[in-house]
Amino acid sequence: MVTRTVLKAPALFCIYSSLNRGDTLQFLNKVDSYLLIRNEPITIDLSEVKVATAAASLLLFSMVNRAQLLLNEPNIVRFHFPNKDKNNEGHRYIVKTGLSRALNSGSLPKLDELVLDEQYFQSSSEPSTHLFSTIEMIQAKAKLNDEQLLLLSSGISEAMLNVSHHAYEHSDFASVNKSIGKRWWQCAWFDPNLDSTVFIIYDLGMGIFKSYAQYQGPSNFMQELQIIKEAFTLGNTRFGTPERGKGSEDIKAPI
């Protein structure tokens, strides 16, 4: 019989607020450690989560899904989800958003089904094809005009291409790239109440700081913040060529 460690998620699962960020990141680090360092099966208990914001949910999806794909073991993680009768608020955040389905999509065919069913949470390693399905999904609800659609398409395209061109360009990721591709995880939807479109993308590569600065040593928060600001300034690029470094403007333009 397989013994599983149970990891209980914090009730307020959020990285936006400094009040909840520490507990949430600590929990996510535990998940990652058990799966990819210890290679131990776990059960993630989300049953008492009251609030799960989009960014934190996406981080959880990415870490769980990466382990499922790399280990070729969809069932290395099991879940306790909120019960609608006992925890309706948590059920709305975890189940109704499709997060619960995404967390159980531990194979490439299952991930493809998320795209076909136009789920909020998706994953891909192919910018050329996934951009179109994402835009189609958003536009079906948002009904953007031509200018808005162009701005959004350009921004999302550049974000996806950044992952493909920069996030995993290091020898440390050679085996990962061969196994699951230069993969990202995303969450996208149109909110009719706010009349706004949301697109969040996350990868598990080296990060902007190391990619842009090609920095290998230890760093501090202010140093990383300054480099990220520089990387998102028009004309700056890790390649150092003047004709490049415009992609960050495409990403910022729809905001």
Q: Which residues make up each language-model segment?
A:
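Short helix/loop capping segments that flank catalytic or ligand/cofactor-binding pockets
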Residues: 104, 209-210
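Glycine-rich G1-box
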Residues: 206
